Curated annotation (Swiss-Prot):
It comes from Bordetella pertussis (strain Tohama I / ATCC BAA-589 / NCTC 13251). This is Glutamine--fructose-6-phosphate aminotransferase [isomerizing]. Coiled coil: none annotated. Homodimer. The active site is at C2 (nucleophile), K605 (for fru-6p isomerization activity). It comes from the Bacteria. It holds the Pfam family SIS. It is an enzyme of class 2 (transferase). Catalyzes the first step in hexosamine metabolism, converting fructose-6P into glucosamine-6P using glutamine as a nitrogen source. Residues 2-221 form the Glutamine amidotransferase type-2 domain.
């Protein structure tokens, strides 16, 4: 959610800090700020506007320096306001500020610490839990910032990534992480901190991924890391090539539109070099794990949860293995019955989703040790924590509403389905060849659906004036209806709900009027005739149907029923293909309504706090 950038160098780092914040804007924020060491003093500029305006303000204030930190904030404690924006300073009494600090996460015992610090004379200027950490570090400071931070984090309960520097030690930045991502960037006589390697693209490609409990001391020519026990540790540096072109719009109006149209490439890349189905696609030892398990437990949040629901249909019908799909934030607090023979599958675009990581640690504590993740970031915490992994190749996704990450997750989960089926003797050579042929044609099939954009834009003009919408699907297309409803509400702010079409008579039909658009996914599968009956129920109540129907489904335009014909029925992979028009409908409806498509209100791209 929030973003951190920090640096210590022998050159003016202000442009690096500002550019880093710009690269982190996609994560979502409501305020931003930068602090630097200048001529023996701490100086800062903060804003509740965009980073571009902050940059102008920094130039007007003539800020510059060799040591500093910067931050984009997403409000958790305290309203979006300049006095709550980071960086926070700490001084005792009327002294000049000595400590500057930024923080991502939530400190659960901040009220207790606040009272303690107020009792020894610290005055709070904000409503944030972050200012508590700044004052705590200052209170514990006795000439060594690294030692003060180590002492301070031992007092913190909750999740955090912090970056801090001190007026009295101007060539030093200290960072720490627990449950929130933080990376170190290595340079020549300069070093950097960030919450995401993307922030350092163009500055360094040498990245160290800190682990939970790590505290790092950055100086000009030295990086020193200690673990939770205070023991010095070595963390491997990775060469990370971040393609900065992902942050360029090109001919597109928004990043979401660009990413929708990148899906043929993203799905093709995710399938790259796959010539046959084998468990080893998911890592060494996958065959043994797949033979030992008797069920799957899928843990995910948001859009990734809907990918898991879709996979349940595939895995149970093709591989014949029972599957449970759980919302990660709920599962970890539920008194569930652990099964040590289950394969736990986590799904996350970033690999840093706090609730999913916490649920993963929870199941491992219950003795469930077979773990696999489907993730878009090879260096993420989730990949490091799991026994097996499949890395999607969606590329950087900047729009808050997930598009290409979702379809590449589905692609990877279908591969998992086939690998499980093969391991259990439920996939013949002929079936494998047929499925591989369909997968290889999938990018072209998605491209054919993207060509329907002009027709979908016409629907969006009708949708834009609505305040409610209903989405219907059956079978493996029901999770796609859920995803379609989520997309519409995320970016257009139209209230939308999704139901299995067979549930209409059990409540949702009461909402159907001539003012309620009903979006229906109508593939030519075994449930089509049942779905047609559900559609007639909507028409009989005056509802207006918007139907995505396969070409040979014999559903035609009529009064109260608008039909867009999909190019072809795509069998088991139909849910992936039917996702695309729902993305386009949501996108163009939001455009007509004039919302901030890439940065919808109140939402963040990467949810790294619980």
């Amino acid at each position: 959610m929030c973003g951190i950038v920090g640096a210590v160098a022998q050159r003016d780092i202000t442009p690096i800090l500002i550019e880093g914040l710009k690269r982190l804007e996609y994560r979502g924020y409501d305020s931003c700020g930068v602090a630097l060491y200048m001529d023996g003093h701490l100086r800062r500029t903060r804003s509740t506007k965009r980073v571009a305006e902050l940059s102008e303000q920094v130039a007007e204030d003539k800020l510059g320096g060799f040591t500093g930190i910067a931050h984009t904030r997403w409000a958790t404690h305290g309203i979006p306001a300049t006095y709550n924006a980071h960086p926070h300073f700490s001084a005792q009494g009327k002294d000049e500020p000595r400590i500057a600090l930024v923080h991502n996460g939530i400190i659960e015992n901040h009220e207790e610490l606040r009272q303690e610090l107020q009792g020894v004379g610290y005055v709070f200027e904000s409503q944030t839990d972050t200012e508590v950490i700044a004052h705590l570090v200052n209170h514990l400071y006795a000439g060594d910032l690294f030692e003060a931070v180590q002492q301070a984090v031992r007092r913190l309960q909750g999740a955090y990534a912090i970056a801090v520097f001190c007026r009295d030690e101007p060539h030093r930045v200290v960072g720490a992480r627990q449950g929130s991502p933080l990376v170190v960037g290595l340079g020549q006589n300069e070093n950097f901190l960030a919450s995401d390697a993307l922030a350092l693209a163009g500055t360094t490609d040498q990245i160290i991924y800190l682990e939970d409990g790590d505290v790092v001391d950055l100086q000009l020519a030295r990086v020193w890391i200690v673990d939770q026990a205070g023991k010095q540790v070595e963390r491997k540096a990775h060469t990370v090539q971040v393609h900065t072109g992902a942050a360029e719009l090109g001919p597109y109006r928004h990043f979401m539109q660009k990413e929708i149209f990148e899906q043929p490439r993203a799905v093709g890349d995710t399938l790259q070099d796959i010539e046959s189905i084998t468990p080893e696609l998911f890592g060494d030892g996958a065959y043994k794990v797949f033979k030992e398990i008797d069920s799957l437990l899928i843990l995910a949040c948001g859009t990734s949860y809907y990918a898991g629901l879709t996979a349940k249909y595939w895995i149970e019908s093709i591989a014949r293995i029972p599957v449970a799909v759980e919302i990660a934030s709920e599962y970890r607090y539920r008194d569930s019955v652990p099964n040590p023979n289950a394969l736990v599958v986590t799904i996350s675009q970033s690999g840093e989703t706090a609730d999913t990581l916490a649920a993963l640690k929870h199941v491992r504590s219950l003795g469930m040790q077979h773990t696999l993740t489907v993730c878009n970031v090879v260096t993420s915490a989730m990949v490091r924590e799991c026994e097996l992994a499949y890395i999607t190749r969606a590329g950087v996704e900047i729009g808050v509403a997930s598009t290409k990450a979702f379809t590449t997750q589905l692609t990877a989960l279908f591969l998992l389905t086939l690998a499980l089926a093969q391991t259990r003797g439920r996939l013949t050579e002929e079936q494998e060849a047929e499925h591989l042929k369909a997968l290889r044609h999938l990018p072209a099939a998605i491209g054919a659906v993207l060509a329907l954009e002009p027709q979908i834009m016409a629907w969006a003009d009708r949708f834009a004036s609505k305040e409610n919408a209903l989405f219907l699907g059956r079978g493996m297309h029901y999770p796609i209806a859920l995803e379609g409803a989520l997309k519409l509400k995320e970016i257009s702010y139209i209230h939308a709900e999704a139901y299995p079409a067979g549930e209409l008579k059990h409540g949702p039909l009461a909402l159907v009027t001539e003012h309620m658009p009903v979006v229906t996914i109508a593939p030519k599968d075994a449930l089509l005739e049942k779905l047609k009956s559900n559609m007639q129920e909507v028409r009989a109540r005056g509802g207006e149907l918007y139907v995505f129907a396969d070409a040979d489904s014999k559903i035609a335009n009529a009064e109260g029923m608008h039909v867009i014909r999909m190019p072809e029925y795509y069998g088991a992979l139909s849910p992936i293909v039917h996702t695309i028009p729902l993305q386009l409908l949501s996108y163009h409806t939001a455009c007509v309504r004039g919302t901030d498509v890439d940065k919808p209100r109140n939402l963040a791209k990467s949810v790294t706090v619980e």
